[in-house]
Each structure stands twice: as C-alpha cells, then as structure tokens.
From Swiss-Prot:
InterPro entries: Inh, Inh/Omp19, Protease_inh_b-brl_dom. It comes from Dickeya chrysanthemi (Pectobacterium chrysanthemi). This is Proteinase inhibitor. Monomer. It is found in: Periplasm. Residues 1-19 form the signal peptide. Keywords: Disulfide bond, Metalloenzyme inhibitor, Metalloprotease inhibitor, Periplasm, Protease inhibitor, Signal. It holds the Pfam family Inh. It comes from the Bacteria. Disulfide bonds join C43-C65.
Amino acid sequence: MKQLIIATLLSALSGGCMASSLRLPSAAELSGQWVLSGAEQHCDIRLNTDVLDGTTWKLAGDTACLQKLLPEAPVGWRPTPDGLTLTQADGSAVAFFSRNRDRYEHKLVDGSVRTLKKKA
C-alpha cells in the first residue's frame, strides 16, 4: 500500500511538472499571416495583436471561407501553452488547435482535420 501511495504521488508530481513546463507564447510571436486548411479549402487569415478583450486578440479573414471550414467564423484568437484557440467575439471557443510540430491541428466531430500553418 505504501508503494502505491508513493507511486501515485510521484506520478502526480511529475505530471504537474510537465504541465508547468509548457510555455505560453506571446501574441507577438504568433501574430501574422496564417493559412487555415481543410481537405479541399484554404483560407488566409491574419492573427492580429489588436486586443479584442483582456486575453483575446482580433482575427481577420474571409468570413464565408472560414464558415466552410469551421462550425462558425471566428473573430478572435488566443494562445494556450499547448495550442491556439480561435474564438467568438465574447471569447468563447470556436475551435482549439493543438500544436503539432510546425503547425496546429483541430479535429472536427465528423473526423475531418483542419490545419493552421503560419506563412513563411
């Protein structure tokens, strides 16, 4: 029993250390021109550093194009330690994109994947 308690504590502590080691990128690091892609559709978007609210920045892009790729067209964005969230005006999430090397990916309910990649 003692070994189980020690193992549980070590697991909890190491998990906490790993989570706290993720760095939150700044808006300036992520701002700029990006491409949102689906299987056959691509939309150019711009992640701006203009503040929409306290923790969300403005996103600019073709609304009609974005609505074809996501459940609704986002108007804002915010960085997270493990990804990037596109948001509505009130800050609620439209889609969370998890970081995958040099791009960010979001899986829709139907299983299709959307990719965000920063233009060079």
